[in-house]
Amino acid sequence: MSLFNINKSKKYLIAVSGGPDSVFLLCNIVKLVDPNDLVVCHVNYNFRSDSNNDQMIVTNLCKQLNLKLEILNINKDYSLLKQNFESWARAQRYDFFNMIASKYQIYNLLVAHNLNDLIETYLLQLQRNNLVDYYGLKPVSHYKDLVVYRPLLDIKKSQILNYLNTNKISYAVDSTNSDIKYQRNKIRATLNENNFTKILDQINKANNNLNSIKKIVDNYLKNNIINNELNLTKELFLLDQTCIQRIIYTYFKLINKENLLLNRSNKTISEIVKRLVNSNKNYWKINLNDHSLIKDYNKLFVIKNSLLEPKTIIINDLNDLINQTTFKNIKEIEQIILKDKNFSYVITTDYEMYKSITTIANKKTNRYFIDRKISYKTRLLSPVVYNIKNKIILNKIKKHY
């Protein structure tokens, strides 16, 4: 049975769990690549009572094939694990592979996902209605320093099992793969390989459609992200909601804030798009853990909540200005106070507090800001200085946009 056209001159790490897929991959790769250019990587989570049997199968196979083997043994009280086991295990596994890659200076990783895995992944993506970068599984992807190759994506599970059983090659059976409390296992139990051709056609069409959407998204973002802020143009609201959702999702990725959407991306992005499309408000805020997403007139940006915390100091005399570092523009404010010299003064970013009690140019501050469309970024981040007695704001209000 032939694998895809693998580069035989490269060196590879191989992820081998001891299950049929990875054992099949290993037994075939050694026929194509010099064994000295291979390093087998195995992770024993000690999650199942029989996990040591998996490790033994891998160890014996590597001895038989004269291959280098690296093992990560994890001993953990899984009752204390607060996150999804599969997600956690994947991170542990791939971080281990990345560490071994650095040790051997081999950054090509082979993993044994097969055609059934590809189909399962696609059907799971449809059920979850996730925003994905690709439907199914990519033949080549990346993780940190690793280039991850999947050479078995054209091979069915039945072909793998037939090969191993015919050649009397031992492999481990993961009992948790039949536990239908996991959604992937439910899908697996209903798969019929006779339907794969039809489903593959659906996947190809879905990815072609996705590529068309990505072109629209990439073009919009290329022209509308400035200083990590997203411009909300008229063109954006002419797009369908699928495109807008993907623009928001990709925006988070481009500003390296994708982690704020983990485990909540679908619900959160839908909420954001719903607000964008349906709300006429110039300003709104959505909390995302320790950050907030803020709509500010025709801008959208992400900011740490700590930066939004209001700061206020009282200046009763010149001594209170000495070594003052609370605000970045304190030198500018000092000059204003030194020129006015009518103590006491308030310096603050507490917009909700000062907007209704102060004035600018004989107008209530709140009305002044509204009339001049002063950005909320300015209102929330830029300090103002005013006299406690007459409550007139003395510094010029600079627009952020």
Swiss-Prot record:
InterPro entries: Rossmann-like_a/b/a_fold (IPR014729), TilS/TtcA_N (IPR011063), tRNA_Ile_lys_synt (IPR012094), tRNA_Ile_lys_synt_N (IPR012795). GO terms for molecular function: ATP binding; tRNA(Ile)-lysidine synthase activity. GO terms for cellular component: cytoplasm. Pfam families: ATP_bind_3 (PF01171). It is an enzyme of class 6 (ligase). Keywords: ATP-binding, Cytoplasm, Ligase, Nucleotide-binding, tRNA processing. Its main location: cytoplasm. GO terms for biological process: tRNA modification. It is found in: Cytoplasm. ATP binds at S17, G18, G19, P20, D21, S22. It catalyses: cytidine(34) in tRNA(Ile2) + L-lysine + ATP = lysidine(34) in tRNA(Ile2) + AMP + diphosphate + H(+). Its EC number is 6.3.4.19. Ligates lysine onto the cytidine present at position 34 of the AUA codon-specific tRNA(Ile) that contains the anticodon CAU, in an ATP-dependent manner. Cytidine is converted to lysidine, thus changing the amino acid specificity of the tRNA from methionine to isoleucine. Belongs to the tRNA(Ile)-lysidine synthase family. The N-terminal region contains the highly conserved SGGXDS motif, predicted to be a P-loop motif involved in ATP binding. This is tRNA(Ile)-lysidine synthase. It comes from Mycoplasma mycoides subsp. mycoides SC (strain CCUG 32753 / NCTC 10114 / PG1).
